[in-house]
C-alpha cells in the first residue's frame, strides 16, 4: 500500500516533479515568489535555497505542501483498501444518517358490511427506521525535520522521495485502519448473529465440499434475487430483494485461490469481467468458521465526515508536526440482504426477530407480534412469548397477541424466545420488541 511519485503526479495532473513547487509558488504572494524562482529541470538547488532562505518562506512551503497538495493526493489515490468501493460518500459534520424502510402491507378480506363502518379507518404504513452515527474520530501525526527539507533539494529525485514519504507516512496508516474497521463490521455482524447463516462443509477440505459450496452459493444468490422478495435474508425481516449485479462476494484469499472464477461467474449468471468486480478478496475473517459473505451493495453504510490536514511549526525543536484527521460513520444496514457461509459448529438458530420491534399501543388495546426464526437446520422451532414490565391484566398469548391493561402506564418489553439447548442446559435465543403505552381517553380502548 505505497503511493509512488507517479501516483502523486497523476493525482495532481502534472508531468514533472518540479510542477509541484510551481503550483505552490503560484498560490503564494509576492514575498514567496521574490525568493523562490520558477522551478525548472535544472535549478533545483536555486529553488531549494530560496525556500530555505527564511522561516516564513519555509512555513508557507510546508503548509501548502502538506495541507493542500498532500490532502489532494490522499483523496485521489484512495483505492488500496479493497472494501473502499462500498463507501457511500461524504456527509457534513454533525449529521446522523436516518435510514427508513417501508415494508409491504397486509391483505384484508373484503366485507361489504364492514366497509361501511371502516371506510375512514386509518392504516398506518409499516415503517421501520435505523440511525447511523459518526463513530470514528481519529488522527495521524508525523514530523518533518529541518534537515529533511534541506536534503530534499539536493536533486529532484530527492524531492520526489521527500514528498512521497510525507504522504505515505499517514496515507498507509489511514488506509490500513479503514480496511480493518470495515472488516470488523463483517465480523461484528456475524458475532451478533445478524447474518442469515448458510451451513457448509469446510470448502477446501475436499473437491466435493468445494463443489457443494458453489452450489449453495448459487442457490442463495437466486433466492436473494427472486422478484417477489423475501424476509429471510436480512436481520430486520423486511420483505426485500437484491439484483444479481448488486450482490458482492467477500472471500478470503485462500478460498478464492481454490475456486474457478468462470464457474463462480456462471453461478451468478454474469460474465467473467463483470463478476470479478463483484468479488472482494481479503486476507481473512477473524471469526472461526466464517468462510465467505454475500452482501447487497447497500449493506455497508460507511461515510466520510471529515478529512483534514493541519500543520504547526515547533521553533524550539526545529521541526514541523502535521496531523491528518479522519472522521467517519462506520455502520451497516440491517435492511439489506446479507448472508454468511459458515463451516464447523453452527447454532441451530442464530437469531429471533420480533416484528414490529417498536410499537405504541393504547391502554386497553392490542398488538399482534410476529417472530421470524433464523434456523440453520431446516427445522421448526417453538417460540415462547412473554411480556415484561407490565401490570396486572397485561398479557401475551402463545401466538404473539399482546393485550394491554386499561390501566397500564409502563413501557413493556415483548420477548420471543427459542430454546436450542437441552433440558439440562438450556440455550436461549431471544428477540425483543419495545412497546410504549398511549393513554386512551375513549371508553373501552382501541386497537393500535
Swiss-Prot record:
GO cellular component, one term: viral procapsid
Keyword Repeat part of the UniProt annotation: no
Origin: domain of life: Viruses
UniProt xrefs under Gene3D superfamilies: 2.60.40.1080
Keyword annotations from UniProtKB, A to Z: Capsid protein, Coiled coil, Late protein, T=3 icosahedral capsid protein, Virion
Stored InterPro entries: Big_2 (IPR003343)
Residue ranges the record marks as coiled coil: 107-127
Domain BIG2: 348-427
Principal subcellular localization: virion
Residue ranges of the TM segments: none
Subcellular location: Virion
Assembly information from the UniProt record: Homohexamer. Homopentamer. The prolate capsid is composed of pentamers and hexamers of the capsid protein.
Function: Assembles to form a prolate capsid shell of about 54 nm in length and 45 nm in width, with a T=3, Q=5 symmetry.
Family that this chain belongs to: Belongs to the phi29likevirus major capsid protein family.
The protein's name in its UniProt record: Major capsid protein
Designated gene of the protein: 8
Amino acid at each position: 500500500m505505497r503511493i509512488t511519485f507517479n501516483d502523486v503526479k497523476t493525482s495532481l495532473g502534472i508531468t514533472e516533479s518540479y510542477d509541484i513547487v510551481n503550483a505552490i509558488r503560484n498560490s503564494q504572494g509576492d514575498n514567496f515568489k521574490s525568493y523562490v524562482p520558477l522551478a525548472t529541470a535544472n535549478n533545483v538547488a536555486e529553488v531549494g535555497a530560496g525556500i530555505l532562505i527564511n522561516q516564513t518562506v519555509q512555513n508557507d512551503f510546508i503548509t501548502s505542501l502538506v495541507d493542500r497538495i498532500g490532502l489532494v493526493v490522499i483523496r485521489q489515490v484512495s483505492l488500496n483498501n479493497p472494501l473502499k468501493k462500498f463507501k457511500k460518500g461524504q456527509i457534513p459534520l454533525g449529521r446522523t444518517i436516518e435510514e427508513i424502510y417501508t415494508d409491504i402491507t397486509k391483505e384484508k378480506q373484503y366485507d361489504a358490511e364492514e366497509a361501511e363502518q371502516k371506510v375512514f379507518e386509518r392504516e398506518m404504513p409499516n415503517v421501520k427506521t435505523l440511525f447511523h452515527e459518526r463513530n470514528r474520530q481519529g488522527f495521524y501525526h508525523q514530523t518533518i525535520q529541518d534537515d529533511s527539507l534541506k536534503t530534499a533539494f539536493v536533486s529532484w529525485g530527492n524531492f520526489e522521495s521527500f514528498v512521497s514519504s510525507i504522504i505515505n507516512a499517514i496515507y498507509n496508516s489511514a488506509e490500513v485502519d479503514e480496511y480493518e474497521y470495515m472488516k470488523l463490521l463483517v465480523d461484528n455482524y456475524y458475532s451478533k448473529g445478524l447474518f442469515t447463516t448458510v451451513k457448509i462443509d469446510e470448502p477446501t477440505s475436499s473437491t466435493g465440499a468445494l463443489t457443494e459450496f458453489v452450489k449453495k452459493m448459487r442457490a442463495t444468490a437466486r433466492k436473494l434475487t427472486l422478484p417477489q422478495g423475501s424476509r429471510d435474508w436480512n436481520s430486520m425481516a423486511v420483505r426485500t430483494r437484491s439484483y444479481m449485479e448488486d450482490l458482492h462476494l467477500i472471500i478470503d484469499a485462500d478460498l478464492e485461490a481454490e475456486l474457478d472464477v468462470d464457474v463462480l461467474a456462471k453461478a451468478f449468471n454474469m460474465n467473467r469481467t463483470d463478476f470479478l468486480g463483484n468479488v472482494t478478496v481479503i486476507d481473512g475473517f477473524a471469526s472461526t468458521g466464517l468462510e465467505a459473505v454475500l452482501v447487497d451493495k447497500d449493506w455497508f453504510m460507511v461515510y466520510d465526515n471529515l478529512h483534514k490536514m493541519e500543520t504547526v511549526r515547533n521553533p524550539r525543536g526545529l521541526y514541523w508536526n502535521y496531523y491528518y484527521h479522519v472522521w467517519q460513520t462506520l455502520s451497516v444496514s440491517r435492511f439489506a440482504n446479507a448472508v454468511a457461509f459458515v463451516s464447523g459448529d453452527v447454532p441451530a438458530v442464530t437469531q429471533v426477530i420480533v416484528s414490529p420491534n417498536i410499537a405504541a399501543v393504547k391502554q386497553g388495546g392490542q398488538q399482534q407480534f410476529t417472530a421470524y426464526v433464523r434456523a440453520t437446520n431446516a427445522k421448526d422451532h417453538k417460540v415462547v412469548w412473554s411480556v415484561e414490565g407490565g401490570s396486572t391484566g397485561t398479557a401475551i398469548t402463545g401466538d404473539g397477541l399482546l393485550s394491554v391493561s386499561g390501566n397500564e402506564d409502563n413501557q413493556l418489553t415483548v420477548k420471543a424466545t427459542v430454546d436450542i439447548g437441552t433440558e439440562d442446559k438450556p440455550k436461549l435465543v431471544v428477540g425483543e420488541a419495545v412497546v410504549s403505552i398511549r393513554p386512551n381517553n375513549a371508553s373501552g380502548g382501541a386497537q393500535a
